[in-house]
Amino acid sequence: MSMHIDGKKITEMYWGGRKIREAWYGGERVFSGSKPVEVMPPISGSNWDARDWLRSKLKEYGENYQTVTEIPFEIDTGEATSMRGMFALCSSLTVVPEMDTSRVDNMAYMFSTCESLTTVPPMDTRNVTNMAYMFRNARNITYIPDLSTGGVRSLGYMFYGCARLTDGNVRLIGKRSFAAVGGMIERSGLTREPFYNSSGRPI
């Protein structure tokens, strides 16, 4: 939910001359820091609803998904289980907001063709089963925080085209038996599939 006055979204709030960090209404956070909060619906499955929702919200803020450099709102993702393609083709995006991903099981194509990203925030991926094409053609990404991948079934083409991502700058913790990894590191800067055990040793 975001807050409006005369049809315009509130981007800053003050009380007694001081900027307000958070505002709540009816038990729901509607404003955080200097950005409003948008609540992502309980999206699930293998469709493109997460992508379509984000693009629709960006349009409400006068932004285009291909040219936006920073998301102009915080995203409450606590009810979502799919982020398939959420930021796909956001080719000018340089910053990804921190999000609650604890319930998410599908991250396929999530950052596909995010050509301006150099990193992403830490993500809880314990419940994720699909990471296929997740960073495909994110050609300028150089570092990815550790991702839990013990339950992931599909990792095909995950880092395809990540030319600046090199060994040691991404660690996938755990590998499921018979996980699909075809094309995982093709055309990337990686020389091996970046799987590690919980002790930090390569698998």
Model-derived regions, located:
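Negatively charged
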Residues: 2-12, 16-203
